[in-house]
Amino acid sequence: MGIHTTDSTNPTDPLPTPATRAGREGLEALLARPGAAVIGLDFDGTLAPIVADPEQARAHPEAVPALAALAPKVASVAVITGRPAGVAVRHGGFAGVSGLEHLVVLGHYGAERWDAVSGTVSAPPSHPGVAAVRAELPGFLDRIGAWRGTWIEEKGRAVAVHTRRAEDPQAAFEALRAPLAELATRHGLIVEPGRMVLELRPPGMDKGVALLEYVREAGAESVTYVGDDLGDLPAYAAVDKLRSDGVPGLLVCSGSSEVTELAERADLVVDGPEGVVRLLRTLAAQLD
């Protein structure tokens, strides 16, 4: 498991030391050649605190200033999220910010892309199974007797069922996994589990695929990835793959008590979005 950062908010504090040799090599490569480094970050739970209503999620108040200080010093910063790219841009407050010209948002696990330079979103046509599931899901949940407090989030190229507001969120989550997987399969979709949420989305794209393709496109010589949830595990696997190909990488976990799998695999664990912001700020200061 990675070590935790300290509680200090002083950006001149020394960087924490990753707990693994591979993580230390990844950090050393970032510091040695920042202009050839890609930094990838999840949004919810990493840059933005988890809230009961995802529509109310916003980036940590210091996230954009920290990114704006760091982004000009590296090859690129990529926010990789299951949200639509445009929603992540709005909730993150990324548009029109000086210093974020090197930022891209890869939404819907890379199916959509927003570039800060152009300010536009590019995307392929939607999977027809999403529209079919969207139409069927309310009645489907009624028929299987879904837990009270369960609710549906419309995500454009995906549909999510949340259990965080249920009387027993974890029990509701477990009870819905198999029925929703059956529904998704029937329409050519997959189920992506997260922190008290089950997302029905098209197969073939995940954060690992998105990160791998972007790092290779950028010709990066090192990669850092920061995440908090099960959907970030493919991105961790992508960093492992890049490491095996000779590209140093650093795995950072935005720690929480809800998901422990990432902390167990990370080189470095920080204390949620506040810890992520602190790390970004400290990196920016170290690269001055």
Which role fits each region the language model picked out?
Residues V38, S76-A78, V104, T224, ...:
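A structural signal for isolated positions on well-ordered beta-strands in alpha/beta enzyme cores
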Residues M1-F43, L47-A52, E62-P65, A69, ...:
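Non-catalytic pre-domain segments flanking phosphatase-related domains
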